């Protein structure tokens, strides 16, 4: 049984906004952020790319070579070629942001690229924005 949360309505509103930006969701541990995002993703997108930086440390190299969306997507595809990146129909979900805060730098470039929606999630205990190399104004 799924317990509907406030975040569910927020995610629906975000999806309806044609000018949506990459989304960072932060909150306490173990409150259902990942479960809510995952449920939303599979109900609304044809393709879901979920990367958990705790469970899959190998993805911490996806910004090698640059933070632009094309480079990040290329590096993800090199690690797991089975994932489908379908423009306009794919959500990229970066979970456990606090373990790889550098990925936040790429969000500006995903916004400019515009082909894919992006949601990041992380715990308040671990997110330290002063550890992020570059902070783009208007994208946090």
Q: Where do the model's predicted regions map?
A:
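Phosphate-binding site recognition
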Residues: 1-140
